[in-house]
Amino acid sequence: MSTVLPKKSMTEEDIKLQYITPAVTSKWSTGKITMETRITDGKINLKGNLVFREKPKRADYLLYLSANNPIAVIEAKDNNHSISYGLQQAMEYARMLDIPFAFSSNGDGFAEHDFLTGKEREFGLDEFPTEAELIARYKGEFGLTPAQETVIDQPYYTSQTTYPPRYYQRIAINRTMDAIARGQQRLLLVMATGTGKTY
């Protein structure tokens, strides 16, 4: 690949455009990838009489099992950092979003943390797992039947008057649907006051 800038001079956005995005889109359908996805609105801080909001947290890439079921997060860094430099940040986002796979890349390759097995590894750009491979690893770990998959893959109710769920609401919905799919007869949903249980 011929580029205008040397790799070490590229910004994070250049690395994403030239290296990471092509590596991911060659293995995943673009309809199951989102970029620069806002995770939080940013922490609200109070300093005296001033109220201000910190910058929102954004995931560079989210890969989806289905519409409301993200399966992997990818954090990109420029090439002046190691392949695994963004892995801790990706893992933080994965924990927040209840996602089983976290990846980071600097354009030379990928580092992966698999929350299902606890294993970490590094591999080349052309070795990124395909959509089918990652989904098979996920479903294989949980041993889902086709009937259970159907329940879990149900889309959320939406209308013109509903807002998209916040990340913690999505987690609560998905965990509830997962428990129902597994045939659990009794469920207890605990969320703090004001967090949107009536979503």
Residue ranges and their predicted role:
Residues 1-199:
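ATP-dependent helicase/translocase motor core
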